[in-house]
Amino acid sequence: MPGTLFLIVGPSGVGKDTLLEGARDRLATSRWFSFPQRVVTRAADAGGEDYIPVTPSEFEQQLAAGAFWHQWHAHGLSYGIPMQVARDLDNGINVVLNASRNEIGAFRDKATHVVTIGISAPPGIVEERLHERGRESEEEIKRRLARLVEQAPLTGYALEIVNDRTIEEGITALVDLIAGACDLNAEITRFPVTIGSKQVCLVHKGNQIASRVLAGSSRVTLSLRGKSVSAELGETWSDEIVSQDLCALSEGAMAALDAVEGDVVSIERSPTPKSRSILQKKVRGGELSHAEMEAFIHDLVNGRFSTSEIAGFLVAASNNLTMDEVISLTQVRAAFAHRHDWGKAIVVDKHSMGGVPGNRITPIIIPILAAFGLTVPKTSSRAITSAAGTADMMEVLSRVDLSPDEMKSVVEQTNGCIAWNGNLTHSPVDDVMNAINRPLGLQSTLLDVSSIMSKKLAAGSTHVLIDMPVGPKAKTRTQGEAGALKNLFESVGQGIGLNTKVQISDGTKPIGRGVGPVLEALDVLSVLRGEAGAPTDLLDKSIGYAATILEWSGAVSQGQGAQVTRDLVSSGKAFEKLFEIRDAQGRQHDPLQPGQFTEDICADRSGRVEAIDIQGISEVARLSGAPKDKAAGVVLNVQVGDQIAEKQPLLRVHSSSLRGIEEAVCAAQAQSAFKIL
């Protein structure tokens, strides 16, 4: 951003030179200000301003050599402005220039940003000052006073100082006008701190521009090479942290700007969000239009709301969004994520509401569908409260942190992928909202559905099948809740043009044997290899869901899906496709080895397994170290309905550390997850 050209104008005797000299003493120590000397055909001992004296012939020589950016003639003298002024302005330096009011128009034609400051004083004070300096005769003083009275007031972008008080007060007034009219630029230095999810900008309290243009502001907008980010504003007197011409930015702010130390950033006070009235409308219970939702989310993502304002919106929206608002929020969230377009009439996806240990059907369904020939770009999350998410499990086989271009390449090669959504369909809206609602513990199906469906929309899907386990300890507790949530998903899907089908399933018990990334991967491979001991519940559920998708999407006739799906598994084509996807994403070469520390949890009595507490199983698996410890978790040795003997192993705990085993076993023994009658 170019610097500002300040033209200081005023007749003789008003104290212009004195004020300029004082302002220079206060500002010129900053790299962002320049007070160039004029070249004047005036004798060196003439007094007054600080100038470069030359003879008329010397002036003409410099003019011919191109030494002047601008020059003019007045009162029998020639004035030249050095070419360095143009270079300074181009480099963002603010130039303060002693100018003639007759040349204001010419300067405005040459510079991008020009501010004129007129210095004036009452005639009586001017006459007194002219007599005191003794440079003019009585006749000259009379002529100057006459011109002073005749001069028209300055117009157009002009500021004025009436210099009728003390010298210090006049200098302060001039510095205030100059510094307050500048754009604030600062060289970046790194501020090695992290304060939650907040970005931070720290400036020196002695920064003359910052102290004026940012006065009263607590947030600023930082801009660099077309990128911008909002940040919390901090101030310090410590030169060790940041000097007067620099700003210290937090790691997050630098990352958002793609900045390095030494870059020059533009700093502005963050404006009051235009959408604040929209926020207030929602908090009062009003309904937002699509345009209002779009404007609000835009300001939200750009950091223009405080934490308390965001919390206010989330509390209001958590239980008070109309269907149209949920649809609008979903569309706007997707617009902030990377949008994928596969150029296919049918692009299928499957999503699970989670909460059931194991249940790793996605890495089985995706290769089945891809082997058939459907396009299935699956993006999945990591675990938040469970022992493993689909991305955690897939990561033991291959890379999952794909870029959009890498994902496109994998899908073009194999028809499918199983990747982490953080780089692909995750919206920055989620980051802002999650940073507030997770600590608050806000539970909202309206916001959850909006988030889930926005990712499916961003992924370019046309058909989405949602697995909704229902059980007293699952995320969806009752059939009534499931019915309402099913209607919400399908209505939002219809509103955003996405074919959506919800399949309600049993959420009362684990699916499969392993719980934890490596242990679940071993189950998946066992099913796809067609091994005799593969978990039948995991196989049957995967076959059922894959068949539903094939029939629902029109890929096969009704009633044919199950047989087609089983053939793809038994022939080994689905297994081969999983390994194709694995290799295309980037194969992990570490062996699938469960944690070497193990301990069995055994039955304290004989009887029949009546129930298995899914939350209890998840807790034990997480205490063992999963999902961060990929090899940790539990293996279930029995299922609901099995007859067992006393001392029979119910599950085996795995961990890569002795501490993980101790904590998991302690929890398992304190409260058994198995109900045996």
From Swiss-Prot:
Residues 188-677 are annotated as: Thymidinephosphorylase. GO terms for cellular component: cytosol. It holds the Pfam family Glycos_transf_3. Keywords: Alkylphosphonate uptake, ATP-binding, Glycosyltransferase, Multifunctional enzyme, Nucleotide-binding, Transferase. GO terms for molecular function: 1,4-alpha-oligoglucan phosphorylase activity; ATP binding; ribose 1,5-bisphosphate phosphokinase activity; thymidine phosphorylase activity. Residues 1-187 are annotated as: Ribose 1,5-bisphosphokinase. It is an enzyme of class 2 (transferase). Pathway: Metabolic intermediate biosynthesis; 5-phospho-alpha-D-ribose 1-diphosphate biosynthesis; 5-phospho-alpha-D-ribose 1-diphosphate from D-ribose 5-phosphate (route II): step 3/3. In the N-terminal section; belongs to the ribose 1,5-bisphosphokinase family. In the C-terminal section; belongs to the thymidine/pyrimidine-nucleoside phosphorylase family. Type 2 subfamily. NCBIfam families: ARCH_P_rylase (TIGR02645), phosphon_PhnN (TIGR02322), PRK04350.1 (NF003338). HAMAP family: PhnN (MF_00836), Thymid_phosp_2 (MF_00703). This is Bifunctional ribose 1,5-bisphosphokinase-thymidine phosphorylase. It comes from Roseobacter denitrificans (strain ATCC 33942 / OCh 114) (Erythrobacter sp. (strain OCh 114)).
